[in-house]
Amino acid sequence: MSWQAYVDEHLMCEIEGHHLTSAAIVGHDGAVWAQSTAFPQFKTEEMTNIMKDFDEPGFLAPTGLFLGPTKYMVIQGEPGAVIRGKKGSGGITVKKTGQAMVVGIYDEPMTPGQCNMVVERLGDYLLEQGL
């Protein structure tokens, strides 16, 4: 299965009639492996900072998580494994795997829990595959 198929079929899938607004799989180096059409353009340093928060949990808390034009307030995640952010009625979930980061962005009517489930389920599968 191509990386794009993982994004299209597993991240952008419908859940209870809703789906993520955008999603991507990005290497630890910030290189995009695959993304949905609406995924925001981002700076390499934004991905570098996300990776740094995985290595040093709490790194993003004082400044927030920036991705493209959006700043998310960092909320409780799983140190070293999952970063979650919130902005208004939407938010972001980032799951770290051995070689990549699975990123999902949502807005109402999708819930944070639905976003977490979609992103973390694919991330866990990739971890099981050694990716």
From Swiss-Prot:
Signal peptide: none annotated. A motif (Involved in PIP2 interaction) lies at residues 81-97. Phosphorylated by MAP kinases. GO terms for biological process: nuclear migration; regulation of actin cytoskeleton organization. GO terms for cellular component: cell cortex; cytoskeleton. One of its GO terms (molecular function) is proline-rich region binding. The modification Phosphothreonine is found at residue 111. The keyword Cytoplasm applies. CDD domains: PROF (cd00148). It is found in: Cytoplasm, Cytoskeleton. It comes from the Eukaryota. Disulfide bonds join 13-115. PROSITE patterns: PROFILIN. Pfam families: Profilin. Keywords: Actin-binding, Allergen, Cytoplasm, Cytoskeleton, Disulfide bond, Phosphoprotein. Its main location: cytoplasm. Occurs in many kinds of cells as a complex with monomeric actin in a 1:1 ratio. Binds to actin and affects the structure of the cytoskeleton. At high concentrations, profilin prevents the polymerization of actin, whereas it enhances it at low concentrations. The variability of the residues taking part of IgE-binding epitopes might be responsible of the difference in cross-reactivity among olive pollen cultivars, and between distantly related pollen species, leading to a variable range of allergy reactions among atopic patients. Belongs to the profilin family. This is Profilin-7. It comes from Zea mays.
